UniProtKB/Swiss-Prot annotation:
Binds to 23S rRNA. One of the proteins that surrounds the polypeptide exit tunnel on the outside of the ribosome. GO terms for biological process: translation. The gene is rpl23. One of its GO terms (molecular function) is structural constituent of ribosome. Keywords: Ribonucleoprotein, Ribosomal protein, RNA-binding, rRNA-binding. It holds the Pfam family Ribosomal_L23. Belongs to the universal ribosomal protein uL23 family. The keyword Ribonucleoprotein applies. It comes from Methanococcoides burtonii (strain DSM 6242 / NBRC 107633 / OCM 468 / ACE-M). Part of the 50S ribosomal subunit. Contacts protein L29. SUPFAM superfamilies: Ribosomal proteins S24e, L23 and L15e (SSF54189). This is Large ribosomal subunit protein uL23.
Amino acid sequence: MNAIRYPFITEKAMMLMDENKLQFVVDTRANKTQVENDVVKMYGFTVKSVCTMTTMKGLKKALVTFNETDAAHEIATRIGLV
């Protein structure tokens, strides 16, 4: 099961990139370990922490913090967000 569905792009999420964090919408059945493993497998950067939250609309979001400096900007550039 691929836990990550798509990146969550808002103005607040873009500001979090300066703190080396990215937000993703994930499968509602996915746990933090699955999200971490998928991020490492897809993008090749080590993950410092994963925080998950469920919105009132029923979406599950994951806030991923990276160990490497500027990893969030590098991933955002690869995806085409920046």
